[in-house]
Protein backbone atom coordinates (compact mmCIF):
# COMPACT_ATOMS: atom_id res chain seq x y z
CA UNK A 1 0.00 0.00 0.00
CA UNK A 2 1.53 3.30 -1.12
CA UNK A 3 0.97 6.70 0.38
CA UNK A 4 -0.89 8.82 -2.15
CA UNK A 5 -0.99 12.60 -1.89
CA UNK A 6 -2.53 15.34 -3.97
CA UNK A 7 0.23 17.37 -5.59
CA UNK A 8 -0.81 20.98 -6.19
CA UNK A 9 1.87 21.27 -8.88
CA UNK A 10 0.40 18.49 -11.04
CA UNK A 11 -3.19 18.88 -9.81
CA UNK A 12 -3.61 15.15 -9.23
CA UNK A 13 -3.01 12.42 -6.68
CA UNK A 14 0.36 10.72 -6.94
CA UNK A 15 2.17 7.87 -5.22
CA UNK A 16 4.66 9.29 -2.77
CA UNK A 17 8.15 8.34 -3.96
CA UNK A 18 10.74 10.10 -1.79
CA UNK A 19 13.80 11.81 -3.19
CA UNK A 20 15.88 9.81 -0.71
CA UNK A 21 14.08 7.11 1.33
CA UNK A 22 16.83 7.38 3.95
CA UNK A 23 15.87 10.98 4.76
CA UNK A 24 12.34 12.27 4.14
CA UNK A 25 12.31 16.08 4.11
CA UNK A 26 9.18 18.14 4.76
CA UNK A 27 8.78 21.89 5.29
CA UNK A 28 5.66 23.75 6.36
CA UNK A 29 5.26 27.51 6.51
CA UNK A 30 4.87 28.61 10.11
CA UNK A 31 3.42 31.77 11.65
CA UNK A 32 4.38 35.41 11.54
CA UNK A 33 4.49 36.03 15.28
CA UNK A 34 2.81 39.33 16.10
CA UNK A 35 -0.35 38.13 17.84
CA UNK A 36 -2.07 35.02 19.17
CA UNK A 37 -2.70 32.59 16.33
CA UNK A 38 -6.20 32.05 14.96
CA UNK A 39 -7.84 28.77 14.09
CA UNK A 40 -6.88 29.19 10.43
CA UNK A 41 -3.21 29.08 11.45
CA UNK A 42 -3.86 25.88 13.38
CA UNK A 43 -5.29 23.86 10.50
CA UNK A 44 -2.00 23.38 8.60
CA UNK A 45 -0.25 22.55 11.88
CA UNK A 46 -2.73 19.76 12.63
CA UNK A 47 -2.88 18.53 9.02
CA UNK A 48 0.87 18.29 8.55
CA UNK A 49 1.45 17.00 12.06
CA UNK A 50 -0.81 14.11 11.04
CA UNK A 51 1.23 13.63 7.87
CA UNK A 52 4.42 13.76 9.97
CA UNK A 53 3.06 10.97 12.17
CA UNK A 54 2.16 8.84 9.14
CA UNK A 55 5.57 9.41 7.55
CA UNK A 56 7.29 8.47 10.81
CA UNK A 57 5.34 5.21 10.79
CA UNK A 58 6.46 4.52 7.21
CA UNK A 59 10.08 5.72 7.31
CA UNK A 60 12.90 5.62 9.84
CA UNK A 61 14.17 9.17 9.31
CA UNK A 62 11.75 12.06 8.73
CA UNK A 63 13.04 15.62 8.97
CA UNK A 64 10.22 18.08 9.49
CA UNK A 65 10.90 21.83 9.55
CA UNK A 66 8.32 24.50 10.40
CA UNK A 67 9.64 28.04 10.51
CA UNK A 68 8.96 31.10 12.64
CA UNK A 69 8.85 34.43 10.80
CA UNK A 70 10.15 36.84 13.43
CA UNK A 71 10.83 39.87 11.21
CA UNK A 72 7.97 41.40 9.26
CA UNK A 73 6.21 44.73 8.85
CA UNK A 74 3.25 43.42 10.90
CA UNK A 75 5.60 42.59 13.78
CA UNK A 76 7.22 46.02 13.53
CA UNK A 77 3.80 47.71 13.64
CA UNK A 78 2.60 45.67 16.63
CA UNK A 79 5.83 46.30 18.55
CA UNK A 80 5.56 50.04 17.93
CA UNK A 81 1.96 50.05 19.15
CA UNK A 82 2.94 48.12 22.29
CA UNK A 83 6.05 50.16 22.92
CA UNK A 84 8.30 47.12 23.16
CA UNK A 85 11.32 45.83 21.21
CA UNK A 86 10.51 43.86 18.07
CA UNK A 87 12.59 40.91 19.25
CA UNK A 88 10.75 40.78 22.59
CA UNK A 89 7.30 40.82 20.98
CA UNK A 90 8.27 38.17 18.44
CA UNK A 91 9.81 35.91 21.09
CA UNK A 92 6.73 36.25 23.29
CA UNK A 93 4.26 35.35 20.57
CA UNK A 94 6.46 32.54 19.26
CA UNK A 95 6.31 31.00 22.74
CA UNK A 96 2.53 31.49 22.87
CA UNK A 97 2.22 29.81 19.47
CA UNK A 98 4.21 26.77 20.62
CA UNK A 99 2.08 26.60 23.77
CA UNK A 100 -1.18 26.62 21.80
CA UNK A 101 0.02 24.06 19.26
CA UNK A 102 1.14 21.72 22.04
CA UNK A 103 -2.43 21.89 23.39
CA UNK A 104 -3.57 20.56 20.00
CA UNK A 105 -1.31 17.50 20.45
CA UNK A 106 1.07 18.72 17.74
CA UNK A 107 4.48 17.08 17.88
CA UNK A 108 7.50 19.35 17.94
CA UNK A 109 9.01 19.55 14.43
CA UNK A 110 12.55 18.28 13.95
CA UNK A 111 13.73 21.81 13.16
CA UNK A 112 12.16 25.18 14.04
CA UNK A 113 14.22 27.79 12.14
CA UNK A 114 13.80 31.49 12.92
CA UNK A 115 14.07 33.93 10.03
CA UNK A 116 16.40 36.36 11.84
CA UNK A 117 18.95 33.57 12.33
CA UNK A 118 19.35 33.11 8.56
CA UNK A 119 20.28 36.54 7.23
CA UNK A 120 23.61 35.28 5.92
CA UNK A 121 21.87 32.64 3.80
CA UNK A 122 19.28 35.15 2.55
CA UNK A 123 21.92 37.65 1.44
CA UNK A 124 23.92 34.88 -0.25
CA UNK A 125 20.88 33.61 -2.17
CA UNK A 126 20.01 37.15 -3.26
CA UNK A 127 23.56 37.68 -4.50
CA UNK A 128 23.44 34.37 -6.39
CA UNK A 129 20.22 35.43 -8.13
CA UNK A 130 21.77 38.77 -9.11
CA UNK A 131 24.87 37.02 -10.44
CA UNK A 132 22.77 34.61 -12.52
CA UNK A 133 20.69 37.40 -14.06
CA UNK A 134 17.46 36.57 -12.23
CA UNK A 135 17.47 39.62 -9.94
CA UNK A 136 18.46 43.27 -10.09
CA UNK A 137 19.17 46.11 -7.68
CA UNK A 138 17.15 49.31 -7.94
CA UNK A 139 16.68 52.22 -5.55
CA UNK A 140 18.00 50.28 -2.54
CA UNK A 141 15.84 47.27 -3.35
CA UNK A 142 16.72 43.96 -4.93
CA UNK A 143 13.93 42.47 -7.03
CA UNK A 144 13.39 39.12 -8.67
CA UNK A 145 12.88 39.40 -12.42
CA UNK A 146 9.89 37.12 -13.02
CA UNK A 147 10.30 37.35 -16.80
CA UNK A 148 13.73 35.73 -16.49
CA UNK A 149 12.12 32.41 -15.52
CA UNK A 150 10.46 30.57 -18.37
CA UNK A 151 7.96 28.59 -16.27
CA UNK A 152 7.14 31.21 -13.64
CA UNK A 153 3.50 30.67 -12.68
CA UNK A 154 3.56 26.91 -13.23
CA UNK A 155 2.74 26.05 -9.61
CA UNK A 156 -0.31 28.31 -9.39
CA UNK A 157 -1.25 27.62 -13.03
CA UNK A 158 -1.34 31.31 -13.94
CA UNK A 159 0.15 33.45 -16.65
CA UNK A 160 1.95 36.69 -15.82
CA UNK A 161 -1.08 38.61 -17.06
CA UNK A 162 -3.43 36.61 -14.83
CA UNK A 163 -1.24 37.29 -11.81
CA UNK A 164 -1.28 41.03 -12.36
CA UNK A 165 -5.05 41.03 -12.88
CA UNK A 166 -5.86 38.99 -9.80
CA UNK A 167 -3.30 40.06 -7.21
CA UNK A 168 -2.39 43.06 -5.19
CA UNK A 169 0.84 44.01 -6.89
CA UNK A 170 2.85 47.01 -5.79
CA UNK A 171 3.57 49.09 -8.89
CA UNK A 172 6.78 50.94 -8.06
CA UNK A 173 8.86 53.05 -10.45
CA UNK A 174 12.01 51.04 -9.71
CA UNK A 175 10.48 47.78 -11.01
CA UNK A 176 11.31 46.60 -14.53
CA UNK A 177 8.00 44.73 -14.58
CA UNK A 178 5.00 45.21 -12.30
CA UNK A 179 5.04 41.54 -11.24
CA UNK A 180 8.65 41.58 -10.02
CA UNK A 181 8.84 40.91 -6.28
CA UNK A 182 11.14 42.07 -3.52
CA UNK A 183 14.05 39.97 -2.32
CA UNK A 184 15.64 42.71 -0.23
CA UNK A 185 14.35 46.13 0.80
CA UNK A 186 15.95 49.12 2.51
CA UNK A 187 15.33 49.84 6.19
CA UNK A 188 14.88 53.28 7.69
CA UNK A 189 17.08 54.22 10.64
CA UNK A 190 14.34 53.39 13.14
CA UNK A 191 13.59 50.03 11.51
CA UNK A 192 15.45 46.74 12.00
CA UNK A 193 18.04 46.12 9.32
CA UNK A 194 21.18 44.26 8.38
CA UNK A 195 24.15 45.32 6.30
CA UNK A 196 24.26 43.94 2.77
CA UNK A 197 25.93 44.66 -0.60
CA UNK A 198 22.86 46.80 -1.38
CA UNK A 199 22.90 48.79 1.83
CA UNK A 200 21.23 48.35 5.18
CA UNK A 201 17.94 46.53 4.83
CA UNK A 202 15.85 43.44 5.52
CA UNK A 203 14.62 40.45 3.52
CA UNK A 204 11.39 40.02 1.63
CA UNK A 205 8.97 37.46 3.02
CA UNK A 206 9.36 34.93 0.20
CA UNK A 207 13.14 34.85 0.47
CA UNK A 208 13.07 33.76 4.10
CA UNK A 209 11.60 30.29 3.52
CA UNK A 210 13.84 29.57 0.53
CA UNK A 211 16.97 30.37 2.53
CA UNK A 212 15.91 28.33 5.57
CA UNK A 213 15.07 25.31 3.43
CA UNK A 214 18.40 25.56 1.61
CA UNK A 215 20.33 25.59 4.89
CA UNK A 216 18.50 22.86 6.77
CA UNK A 217 17.03 20.58 4.09
CA UNK A 218 19.08 21.18 0.94
CA UNK A 219 18.21 22.19 -2.60
CA UNK A 220 15.38 19.67 -3.13
CA UNK A 221 12.80 18.52 -0.59
CA UNK A 222 10.03 15.96 -0.69
CA UNK A 223 7.04 17.90 0.63
CA UNK A 224 6.25 21.58 1.09
CA UNK A 225 2.99 22.34 2.86
CA UNK A 226 0.85 25.28 3.84
CA UNK A 227 -2.55 26.86 3.45
CA UNK A 228 -4.15 27.28 0.03
CA UNK A 229 -3.77 31.04 0.34
CA UNK A 230 0.02 30.61 0.10
CA UNK A 231 0.05 29.04 -3.37
CA UNK A 232 0.30 32.51 -4.90
CA UNK A 233 2.28 34.58 -4.43
CA UNK A 234 4.31 33.04 -1.60
CA UNK A 235 4.97 29.51 -2.82
CA UNK A 236 5.15 30.52 -6.46
CA UNK A 237 7.86 33.02 -5.54
CA UNK A 238 9.68 30.59 -3.27
CA UNK A 239 9.86 28.12 -6.12
CA UNK A 240 11.14 30.80 -8.51
CA UNK A 241 13.91 31.97 -6.17
CA UNK A 242 15.15 28.55 -5.21
CA UNK A 243 15.11 26.93 -8.64
CA UNK A 244 16.77 29.91 -10.29
CA UNK A 245 19.41 30.08 -7.54
CA UNK A 246 20.19 26.40 -8.13
CA UNK A 247 20.24 26.39 -11.93
CA UNK A 248 16.78 24.91 -12.39
CA UNK A 249 17.15 22.07 -9.89
CA UNK A 250 13.73 20.95 -8.63
CA UNK A 251 12.84 22.71 -5.39
CA UNK A 252 9.87 20.66 -4.17
CA UNK A 253 8.64 17.29 -5.40
CA UNK A 254 5.18 17.41 -3.79
CA UNK A 255 3.31 20.60 -2.94
CA UNK A 256 0.41 20.17 -0.48
CA UNK A 257 -2.13 22.80 0.53
CA UNK A 258 -5.00 22.68 3.00
CA UNK A 259 -8.34 24.39 2.39
CA UNK A 260 -9.78 27.50 3.99
CA UNK A 261 -11.71 27.68 7.24
CA UNK A 262 -15.12 29.34 7.32
CA UNK A 263 -16.61 30.60 10.58
CA UNK A 264 -20.33 29.86 10.89
CA UNK A 265 -20.63 29.67 7.11
CA UNK A 266 -18.60 32.79 6.29
CA UNK A 267 -14.97 32.98 5.23
CA UNK A 268 -12.79 33.99 8.15
CA UNK A 269 -11.43 37.48 7.51
CA UNK A 270 -10.32 40.60 9.33
CA UNK A 271 -12.96 42.68 7.55
CA UNK A 272 -15.76 40.47 8.92
CA UNK A 273 -14.22 40.47 12.38
CA UNK A 274 -14.83 36.74 12.78
CA UNK A 275 -11.31 35.61 13.66
CA UNK A 276 -11.24 32.99 16.43
CA UNK A 277 -7.96 32.52 18.25
CA UNK A 278 -6.90 29.09 19.40
CA UNK A 279 -6.42 30.48 22.91
CA UNK A 280 -10.02 31.69 22.97
CA UNK A 281 -11.31 28.27 21.90
CA UNK A 282 -9.12 26.50 24.47
CA UNK A 283 -11.00 28.34 27.21
CA UNK A 284 -14.12 26.34 26.31
CA UNK A 285 -12.85 23.08 24.80
CA UNK A 286 -9.91 20.71 25.30
CA UNK A 287 -7.25 20.94 22.62
CA UNK A 288 -8.02 17.43 21.42
CA UNK A 289 -11.59 18.49 20.63
CA UNK A 290 -10.27 21.33 18.47
CA UNK A 291 -7.88 18.94 16.74
CA UNK A 292 -10.69 16.44 16.11
CA UNK A 293 -12.81 19.22 14.60
CA UNK A 294 -9.96 20.25 12.28
CA UNK A 295 -9.57 16.64 11.12
CA UNK A 296 -13.30 16.08 10.63
CA UNK A 297 -13.08 17.26 7.01
CA UNK A 298 -10.57 16.12 4.39
CA UNK A 299 -7.70 18.60 4.55
CA UNK A 300 -8.09 19.97 1.00
CA UNK A 301 -11.75 20.84 1.47
CA UNK A 302 -13.12 23.95 3.12
CA UNK A 303 -14.08 23.50 6.76
CA UNK A 304 -17.06 25.23 8.34
CA UNK A 305 -15.88 25.83 11.89
CA UNK A 306 -18.60 26.45 14.47
CA UNK A 307 -19.61 25.85 18.07
CA UNK A 308 -21.85 23.06 16.80
CA UNK A 309 -18.87 21.33 15.15
CA UNK A 310 -16.91 21.56 18.40
CA UNK A 311 -19.82 20.11 20.38
CA UNK A 312 -20.13 17.27 17.87
CA UNK A 313 -16.39 16.64 18.11
CA UNK A 314 -16.56 16.54 21.91
CA UNK A 315 -19.43 14.04 21.75
CA UNK A 316 -17.50 11.87 19.29
CA UNK A 317 -14.43 11.83 21.50
CA UNK A 318 -16.59 11.03 24.53
CA UNK A 319 -17.93 8.03 22.64
CA UNK A 320 -14.45 6.84 21.64
CA UNK A 321 -13.01 7.31 25.11
CA UNK A 322 -16.07 5.56 26.49
CA UNK A 323 -15.13 2.46 24.52
CA UNK A 324 -11.57 2.60 25.84
CA UNK A 325 -12.93 3.03 29.36
CA UNK A 326 -15.23 0.03 29.09
CA UNK A 327 -12.73 -2.46 30.47
CA UNK A 328 -9.56 -2.33 32.50
CA UNK A 329 -8.06 -5.39 30.87
CA UNK A 330 -4.73 -4.99 29.08
CA UNK A 331 -5.07 -4.10 25.40
CA UNK A 332 -3.58 -6.14 22.58
CA UNK A 333 -1.24 -3.93 20.49
CA UNK A 334 -2.22 -3.60 16.84
CA UNK A 335 1.26 -4.42 15.55
CA UNK A 336 1.57 -5.16 11.82
CA UNK A 337 -2.23 -5.48 11.52
CA UNK A 338 -2.46 -1.67 11.55
CA UNK A 339 -0.90 -1.43 8.09
CA UNK A 340 -3.61 -3.73 6.68
CA UNK A 341 -6.53 -1.98 8.36
CA UNK A 342 -9.22 0.10 6.61
CA UNK A 343 -8.41 3.10 8.80
CA UNK A 344 -4.77 3.05 7.80
CA UNK A 345 -5.78 2.71 4.15
CA UNK A 346 -7.87 5.86 4.54
CA UNK A 347 -4.89 7.83 5.83
CA UNK A 348 -2.72 6.50 3.01
CA UNK A 349 -5.25 7.90 0.53
CA UNK A 350 -4.28 11.57 0.76
CA UNK A 351 -4.94 11.74 4.52
CA UNK A 352 -8.63 10.89 4.38
CA UNK A 353 -9.13 11.64 8.07
CA UNK A 354 -12.97 11.64 7.99
CA UNK A 355 -12.93 8.03 6.78
CA UNK A 356 -10.24 7.10 9.31
CA UNK A 357 -12.36 8.65 12.08
CA UNK A 358 -15.38 6.63 10.94
CA UNK A 359 -13.21 3.51 11.30
CA UNK A 360 -12.43 4.55 14.88
CA UNK A 361 -16.16 4.63 15.59
CA UNK A 362 -16.59 1.20 13.98
CA UNK A 363 -13.86 -0.18 16.25
CA UNK A 364 -15.56 1.45 19.24
CA UNK A 365 -18.82 -0.31 18.33
CA UNK A 366 -16.92 -3.60 18.23
CA UNK A 367 -15.59 -2.94 21.73
CA UNK A 368 -19.06 -2.15 23.07
CA UNK A 369 -20.61 -5.28 21.54
CA UNK A 370 -17.88 -7.69 22.65
CA UNK A 371 -17.38 -9.13 26.12
CA UNK A 372 -15.05 -6.77 28.04
CA UNK A 373 -12.37 -9.41 28.69
CA UNK A 374 -12.53 -10.94 25.22
CA UNK A 375 -9.67 -10.94 22.75
CA UNK A 376 -12.00 -9.28 20.22
CA UNK A 377 -12.53 -6.29 22.51
CA UNK A 378 -8.86 -5.98 23.40
CA UNK A 379 -7.75 -6.24 19.76
CA UNK A 380 -10.25 -3.58 18.72
CA UNK A 381 -9.01 -1.29 21.49
CA UNK A 382 -5.42 -1.82 20.39
CA UNK A 383 -6.32 -0.97 16.81
CA UNK A 384 -8.25 2.09 17.97
CA UNK A 385 -5.25 3.45 19.86
CA UNK A 386 -2.78 2.74 17.06
CA UNK A 387 -4.94 4.36 14.38
CA UNK A 388 -5.87 7.31 16.59
CA UNK A 389 -2.22 7.93 17.44
CA UNK A 390 -1.48 8.53 13.74
CA UNK A 391 -4.01 11.37 13.93
CA UNK A 392 -2.88 12.67 17.32
CA UNK A 393 -6.16 11.58 18.92
CA UNK A 394 -7.07 9.55 22.03
CA UNK A 395 -3.89 10.72 23.73
CA UNK A 396 -5.47 10.94 27.22
CA UNK A 397 -6.17 8.25 29.77
CA UNK A 398 -9.95 7.68 29.56
CA UNK A 399 -10.49 8.49 33.24
CA UNK A 400 -8.48 11.69 32.90
CA UNK A 401 -10.51 12.62 29.82
CA UNK A 402 -13.86 12.29 31.54
CA UNK A 403 -12.75 13.76 34.84
CA UNK A 404 -10.33 16.36 33.54
CA UNK A 405 -11.13 19.96 34.30
CA UNK A 406 -13.46 19.11 37.16
CA UNK A 407 -12.72 21.48 40.01
CA UNK A 408 -14.50 19.33 42.55
CA UNK A 409 -12.47 17.22 44.93
CA UNK A 410 -12.16 13.73 43.44
CA UNK A 411 -12.21 12.01 46.82
CA UNK A 412 -15.48 13.79 47.67
CA UNK A 413 -17.05 12.64 44.39
CA UNK A 414 -15.93 9.06 44.86
CA UNK A 415 -17.11 9.07 48.47
CA UNK A 416 -20.59 10.09 47.32
CA UNK A 417 -20.52 7.40 44.62
CA UNK A 418 -19.63 4.81 47.27
CA UNK A 419 -22.44 6.09 49.53
CA UNK A 420 -24.87 5.88 46.61
CA UNK A 421 -23.78 2.33 45.84
CA UNK A 422 -24.38 1.32 49.46
CA UNK A 423 -27.75 3.08 49.44
CA UNK A 424 -28.79 1.02 46.42
CA UNK A 425 -27.65 -2.18 48.17
CA UNK A 426 -29.72 -1.14 51.19
CA UNK A 427 -32.66 -0.40 48.85
CA UNK A 428 -32.60 3.26 49.87
CA UNK A 429 -33.34 4.33 46.32
CA UNK A 430 -34.52 7.82 47.22
CA UNK A 431 -31.13 8.58 48.80
CA UNK A 432 -29.34 7.11 45.77
CA UNK A 433 -31.34 9.41 43.51
CA UNK A 434 -30.57 12.39 45.75
CA UNK A 435 -26.84 11.74 45.42
CA UNK A 436 -27.10 11.48 41.63
CA UNK A 437 -28.94 14.82 41.50
CA UNK A 438 -26.51 16.44 43.95
CA UNK A 439 -23.58 15.48 41.74
CA UNK A 440 -25.45 16.51 38.60
CA UNK A 441 -25.99 19.97 40.09
CA UNK A 442 -22.20 20.21 40.47
CA UNK A 443 -21.68 19.28 36.82
CA UNK A 444 -20.84 15.63 37.46
CA UNK A 445 -22.68 12.92 35.51
CA UNK A 446 -22.85 9.30 36.65
CA UNK A 447 -22.92 6.31 34.31
CA UNK A 448 -24.00 2.92 35.65
CA UNK A 449 -22.99 -0.31 33.94
CA UNK A 450 -22.48 -3.92 34.88
CA UNK A 451 -18.83 -3.07 35.58
CA UNK A 452 -19.82 -0.41 38.14
CA UNK A 453 -20.38 3.34 38.25
CA UNK A 454 -18.14 5.86 36.50
CA UNK A 455 -18.35 9.64 36.38
CA UNK A 456 -17.49 12.46 34.03
CA UNK A 457 -17.73 16.20 33.90
CA UNK A 458 -20.84 17.42 32.07
UniProtKB/Swiss-Prot annotation:
Q: Which residues form a coiled coil?
A: none
Cell location: Cytoplasm
- Classification via PANTHER family: CYSTEINE--TRNA LIGASE, CYTOPLASMIC (PTHR10890:SF3), CYSTEINYL-TRNA SYNTHETASE (PTHR10890)
From which source organism is this entry? Teredinibacter turnerae (strain ATCC 39867 / T7901)
**Protein name, entry field:** Cysteine--tRNA ligase
Q: What class of enzyme is it?
A: ligase
What the entry lists under SMART domains is as follows: DALR_2
Please tell me where ATP binds in this chain. 270
Q: What Pfam family does this protein match (any one)? A: tRNA-synt_1e
Describe how the cofactor binds.
Binds 1 zinc ion per subunit.
Its subunit composition reads: Monomer.
One of the GO biological process terms: cysteinyl-tRNA aminoacylation
Q: Which InterPro entries does this one have?
A: Cys-tRNA-ligase (IPR015803), Cys-tRNA-synt_Ia_DALR (IPR015273), Cys-tRNA/MSH_ligase (IPR024909), CysS_C (IPR056411), Rossmann-like_a/b/a_fold (IPR014729), tRNA-synt_1_cat_dom (IPR032678), tRNAsynth_Ia_anticodon-bd (IPR009080)
Q: Which SUPFAM superfamilies match?
A: Anticodon-binding domain of a subclass of class I aminoacyl-tRNA synthetases, Nucleotidylyl transferase
Q: Can you tell me which residues bind Zn(2+)? A: 29, 209, 234, 238
Which reaction(s) does the protein catalyse, per the Swiss-Prot or TrEMBL entry? tRNA(Cys) + L-cysteine + ATP = L-cysteinyl-tRNA(Cys) + AMP + diphosphate
Amino acid sequence: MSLRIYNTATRQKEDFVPVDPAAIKMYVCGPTVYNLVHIGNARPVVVFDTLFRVLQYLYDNVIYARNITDIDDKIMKAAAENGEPISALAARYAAEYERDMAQLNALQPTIVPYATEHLEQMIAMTQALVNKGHAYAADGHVLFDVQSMGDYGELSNRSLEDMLDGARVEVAPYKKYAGDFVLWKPSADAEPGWESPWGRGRPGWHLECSAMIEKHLGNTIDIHGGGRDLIFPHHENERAQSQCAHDGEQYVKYWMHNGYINIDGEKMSKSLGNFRTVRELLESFPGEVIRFALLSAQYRSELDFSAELLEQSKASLDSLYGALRKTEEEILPAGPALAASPGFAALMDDLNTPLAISELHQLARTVHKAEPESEEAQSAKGMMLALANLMGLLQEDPETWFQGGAEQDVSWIEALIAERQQAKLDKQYARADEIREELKAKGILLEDSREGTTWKKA
